């Protein structure tokens, strides 16, 4: 990936954005999926990329030069809707991460599951929301910013209270309100 000169559209698959803060234990900032542009913010503010990208599954990407994207989005007013869609998607990820970061420690894991469900969940016929197999427990731990002990304690609580379960390597969320939100196309609380 040439982050200095290109922007990438995720056609399929999942990619983790890991904050490049110089520490060895950098955490997942967001998980991007189909329809998301990687490295897009660098086009807007001409800044350096602050993320490392890690594929979580097999992925297909389209590569666009920054110069072509800038020309395409700025020269034609009819592309304003396209720009809006890209920015809405990007800011939804930022908004969800801020909600999770500002929530009390006891709610961080539940918020993590809700965020991932709103971004990537698949509705099941039984009224549950299924996270893609590519989003593993270790990814949820990294995204939540919880210590391992707090994470696994909270994970056990969510399991024993039947809010989540794991079947066939996929996390399943039992939350009718969340299911209804996704069904109605809502992307935030």
Task: For the regions a language model picked out, list residue spans one by one.
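Conserved short histidine dyad/triad with adjacent acidic residue
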Residues: 1-3, 21, 32-36
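Structural motif
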Residues: 14, 58-60, 170
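Cyclic-nucleotide recognition modules
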Residues: 29-95
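Phosphate-/nucleic-acid-contacting segments
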Residues: 118-189
């Amino acid at each position: 990936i040439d982050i200095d000169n290109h922007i990438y559209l995720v056609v399929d698959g999942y990619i983790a954005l890991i904050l490049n803060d110089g520490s060895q234990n950098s955490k997942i900032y967001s998980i991007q999926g189909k329809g998301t542009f990687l490295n897009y913010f660098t086009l807007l503010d001409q800044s350096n990329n602050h993320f490392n990208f890690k594929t979580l599954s097999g992925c297909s990407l389209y590569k666009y030069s920054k110069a072509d994207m800038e020309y395409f989005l700025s020269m034609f007013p009819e592309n304003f809707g396209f720009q809006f869609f890209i920015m809405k998607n990007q800011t939804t990820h930022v908004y969800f991460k801020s909600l999770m970061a500002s929530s009390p420690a006891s709610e961080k894991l539940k918020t993590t599951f809700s965020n991932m469900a709103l971004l990537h969940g698949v509705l099941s016929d039984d009224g549950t929301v299924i996270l893609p197999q590519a989003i593993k427990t270790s990814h949820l731990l990294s995204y939540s910013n919880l210590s391992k002990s707090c994470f696994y304690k909270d994970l056990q609580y969510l399991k024993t209270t039947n809010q989540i379960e794991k079947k066939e390597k996929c996390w399943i969320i039992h939350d009718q309100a969340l299911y209804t939100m996704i069904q109605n196309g809502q992307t935030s609380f």
